[in-house]
């Protein structure tokens, strides 16, 4: 684990399984149906159990009948997970267009806004959209760091954890974060 101070907040980078992270909330790289899928989404639904499935079904029924739009976020309990909450967000399917970056930024930023509304100060993120959705990892990492630091720019006391699966992604993210935070943390 590597950690950085940022304007009265803490940014941690961890290699591991996001479902095992100790944090008030973990972020799910969901699909629009909110009903589980592969990767992080499938792992969260599997480990979190029926409670998450039922709460997601209720969100679909009452709030998102056409599915959770890309760049938007919503919240459920954490079910059987260590985290008390799961913040579900849908990242973009990468097509190499400017809107992809805007949508990915929004996925991170909206997740943080949802956390703030619920008084959550410890949030763990996976690398949204970098799996089956095909977003280039390094580009997505810089967007994630930008969204998080923009959100934290006038706040204190937050702990943001980036949880990366695999040593190569972890090392790449640590290097990018170090460069990014040195440039944007006067």
UniProtKB/Swiss-Prot annotation:
Protein family per UniProt: Belongs to the MacroD-type family.
Pfam family, one: Macro
Protein name: Uncharacterized protein TV0719
Residue ranges constituting the Macro domain according to the UniProt record: 1-181
InterPro entries membership: Macro_dom, Macro_dom-like
Coiled coil: none
Gene3D superfamilies membership: Leucine Aminopeptidase, subunit E, domain 1
Organism: Thermoplasma volcanium (strain ATCC 51530 / DSM 4299 / JCM 9571 / NBRC 15438 / GSS1)
Entry-linked SUPFAM superfamilies: Macro domain-like
